[in-house]
Amino acid sequence: MHVLFIIDPLPLLKAYKDSSVAMMQALQARGHTLSVALQGDLYIDAGEVRTRFAPIALRDGADLHGHDWWRETGAADEAPLARFDAVVMRKDPPFDMEYVYSTHLLEYAQQQGARVFNSGAAIRNHPEKLAITEFPDLTTPTLVTRDMARIRAFHAAQGDVIVKPLDDMGGTGIFRLQRSEPNLNAILETLTDNGTRTIMAQRYIPEIVKGDKRILLIGGEPMPYSLARIPLAGETRGNLAAGGRGVAQPLSERDLHLARTVADRLAGRGLLLVGLDVIGDYITEVNVTSPTCFVEITEQTGFNVPEMFAVALESAAG
């Protein structure tokens, strides 16, 4: 297969721990050809969705901590997305309007015969914070609003809550508001931009000290290990980008129940790869844009997550 990755600039990736790079390694090892494009390389001309792209290969034995782990194998070119055997959307959030426009282009490309994973419509229809509202029986009490009075009432009722923006990643903009929080109003004014920006509030889950678990669904199947991202002392965010420590562990019975319930519900929606965030017994996010933790789980357990993704992509792309 010729696989196109729509991805952030390669020099900016931390290749040694980047899940997209791990995917590329697995696909290249299985004999597939790789190309990359940036989000801004997508365009429509005369009704056809096309992209500028660069064919690449990963260097054998390269130090992934350096900057020469990949090489271009030919001149940059342009082609319709439908010409590739598979298009893998791996652009990281924020999920801004440019991202939304990209999902529309990907959806149009699919209508023209492109095979896109995750599909443009599926990414757009499952915003990562909001998607949990489809599963109220699997989540902690949750409120989505920009009404500061409503958030204050929710906080008063729950006593200890987490508030966060809907369109960020890596733990950015997340606050814990305990009952006696003296800066409650200032935090809400900032996050909601004085009541003009919708945010999410959730009852605090004390099991965060044991880790914010990332559970991966690939081709509708739960991977047997999660990565528990354990917060630094004094932190409420387990995200690795916020300094959390990742510890791989087998799925518990509850984890497996959550994963299978979500997988069954999402079946047939164009989501080849999903990352569930689980704290305690509850799902806190459903990640569909650029789920990570492939490398950490593989290195700690020996279970080859990138290989599983490559096999699933081959099957899905036909």
UniProtKB/Swiss-Prot annotation:
Q: What Gene Ontology terms describe what this protein does at the molecular function level?
A: ATP binding; glutathione synthase activity; metal ion binding
Entry annotated with the keyword Nucleotide-binding: yes
NCBIfam families for the chain = glut_syn (TIGR01380), PRK05246.1 (NF003573)
On cofactor binding, the record's note says:
Binds 1 Mg(2+) or Mn(2+) ion per subunit.
Q: Which residues bind ATP?
A: 155-211
Q: Which domain of life does the protein's organism represent?
A: Bacteria
User: In its UniProt entry, what is this protein called?
Assistant: Glutathione synthetase
Q: What is its EC number?
A: 6.3.2.3
* InterPro entries noted in UniProt: ATP-grasp, ATP_grasp_subdomain_1, Glut_synth_pro, GSHS_ATP-bd, GSHS_N, PreATP-grasp_dom_sf
Q: In which pathway does it act?
A: Sulfur metabolism; glutathione biosynthesis; glutathione from L-cysteine and L-glutamate: step 2/2
The entry marks the following residues as binding Mg(2+), namely: 285, 287
